[in-house]
Amino acid sequence: MTNGLRKIELLAPAKNLECGIAAIDHGADAVYIGAAQFGARQTAGNSTEDIAELTRYAHQFGAAVYVTVNTIVYEKELHVLEHLLRQLVEMGVDAILVQDMAVLEIYKKLKAEYMTSGYRMPALHASTQTDNRSADKVKWLKENGFERVVLARELSLEEIANIHKAHPDVELEAFVHGALC
């Protein structure tokens, strides 16, 4: 941080392990990647082994790995989701991007379980799919444990500034390259 300003993070999409490594090699501060399930990129299909390898690689260079768990989760999938979240915690990913609040509930349960285990819980990032358009929504997300909020893509710079003024302690993320990830 310089002069009270936060450093801008260069966050790159990684459709697979190779793209993630290339992004880090070319200066990305962080990458986001989807697993085989629960990611909005249906074609991602990355194994947990690939995500673990990317996480190890990224951490060698001080970069972060965020995993997208940003689809609607159905009741019958909750046990699979919990298993995935456990794997992500244990491999040391830096954050989980969330759409469905069922992920939040399982995360809270795991946080209580892992509290004394030596594992660090990944940060929670609210995906743009949670339709983050207002200071009130950002407040609610913060109160529920989210450290970063990915704002709706349609917001103006003025609207983003107003949200930041209302919640300067919450990390805000905005897409700057268009509507596609």
Predicted features and spans:
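Glycine-rich, proline-tolerant flexible connector loops at the mouths of alpha/beta enzymes
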Residues: 31-50, 68-76
